[in-house]
Structures are given as C-alpha cells and as structure tokens.
Amino acid sequence: MKTVAVVDGDIVAYRCAAANETRSIVATHKVTGQSQSFPHRTAFRAQIQGLYEESEYDVVDVQTPEDISHAFHGMNTTIKALKESCKAITREIYLSGKDNFRDKLPLPVIQYKGNRSEMIRPVQLKECREYLKNSGAIIIDGREVDDMLAQRCWEGKRDGHKNIACTIDGDQHGVEGWMYNWTKMSEPKLIQGLGDIWPHEKIKNDFDGYGRKFFYAQWVFGDPVDKFKPCQIAGKKFGVVGLFGILKDCKTDKECIQAVYDQYKRWIPDGVITYKAWDGTEHTKTIVEVMDMYAACAHMKRWEDDVFNTEALLDKVGVKR
C-alpha cells in the first residue's frame, strides 16, 4: 500500500512565518505624544487600568521578523517530520489560490470567512508561500485546500492507497480517511463511521468530534472560525446546549439528518424564508435550499464537481417532512 503525506501548505507557511517574528505594540498618548512599547495589548491595558482610557491612545502593532532563512528551515523541518510521522514514501503540498466558491454564498450577516482580512498576517507569509511553490506545492483555485485534502483521502480509499491529510484544521474531522494533526496526535488517525461529538475542551460554546456526526453538527451549528452560523438566517440563537440537545442521542445517520432537518424547520416554520445577505442582496429560499447553502460551507468536496444534494439525501434516508 502506497502511503502519501498530503500537507496543508497554508498552515505550514503561516505557522513558520508567525514563529519567525516577534510581535509587540506601541501605545502613543494622543495629547502628550508620549509612547511606550508593550509585548501585547493585555499588558498595555493592565498598566493604564484606573488611570487612563484606552481611547486616549493610538495603538500600533509592530512585527519584527528574523532572517527569512529560519522560516524556510522551519518549513523544511516540519514537512520532513510530517512525512516521517506518516511513514510516507512521498509528500504532496497544497496552497490556496483564488476564487473560493464559498466566498460567493449569500450567507446572512457576514461573508464566509469574513473579517479575516482584519487579522494581522505574518510579515514573511508571502515569501514562505512562494518558497513552498518553488518546492513543488500545488495551487488550488476555486475551492479550499481542505477540499483537496478531502479529495486525496477519497482517492486513496478508492485506489487502495493511504493518503494522510496533514492538517490542524478541524474541518478534516468530518472527512472520511486518514488524518494527522501533528499538534495533537502522536500518529495518524483513521476517521470513519458515524463518529461522535463532545464539548470543546478549550473553546466555550463550541464542540469537537469526528466522523459524519461532526459534519452534521457543523451543518446545523456552523463554524465560528469560518464565520457561518445557520441560525442567523432566522435571527435566532443556537448554542452547544441546543446542538447536543438534538444530536447527543442520535445513533444513526437517519436520526442525525432528521434532527438537523427538524431544527431548520423550527427556524423556518413556513418552509420559506426571505432574508438579506452579507452583501445587501435579498434572497428567498426554501428549507432545503438553506440547508444546501450551509452544507456547501461544511462539506469538503471529494472531487471538483462534488455538490452536496440535501433533497436527495433526505429522500435516501427517509426523513419525515
């Protein structure tokens, strides 16, 4: 059996670029002009607490990178270690490109992965990505690296190979196939079957898990990292208590899918809803169409034209409507 380490290059590049710089802030008082450096905003706020308001200061983020060769070395070391941990004979590296189809989904409130442009990116991220490209990384346009990792896992199962998705992204927990999260796992893990979900041990009002139930949970709960939350389409709230209330005792795919459908029906009791999307456009969708939209957010494409069909799935498992 051929074993391949399928690497999420986006994560490797980001982590190594971030590790190769020191971050701090400079706070300047708007009236006096006096400036002071702090390691982070928490330290700054602690010093001015009870003395000044944060609004009295201009705060600037400062990023100080080390020599780029250290970041390159970090990426080489990481990828070599991934290959060895997976006991792979070769490795593949994928990087995100342009035109992710999910960016165009008419989600309410906020665009898919919205607000990420406001995040501070490592100074050397572009150079690290370019280095991986020159090392043979493949650019994925039209969808995400997560989709490509899911595709390679599916192709491995189809062809009798062991393609191991090397990523720390939680979305992979809902994809059938081999996965290796080098920050949490001592060795690759096979994700298969219905699986299970449980409260996230570090993040409040979030969950963790694996298998198809993890996907079903994302389908109805959403993903705070990717900025989609199905209950927002109806202006409702839905947390982990509600999530476990509908999925905890489900033992089969049919029970899970029925529970997900029933929750969407509670949000959209008339069967149709009209809402305003993040870009200001107005849309009218049926329950199934809304479920299709959110499934598109959570479902990783196993091939380029792999489209999730809610209607067909509901009919296949015999969901009562």
Residue ranges and their predicted role:
Residues 33, 320-321:
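Short amphipathic alpha-helical patches
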Residues 88, 111-320:
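Extended two-metal-dependent nuclease catalytic cores across DNA- and RNA-processing enzymes
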Residues 2-162, 166, 177-186, 190-192:
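Noncatalytic, basic helical substrate-engagement surface that gates or grips nucleic-acid strands
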Residues 1-2, 288:
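Extreme N-terminus of proteins, especially the signal/transit-peptide cleavage junction
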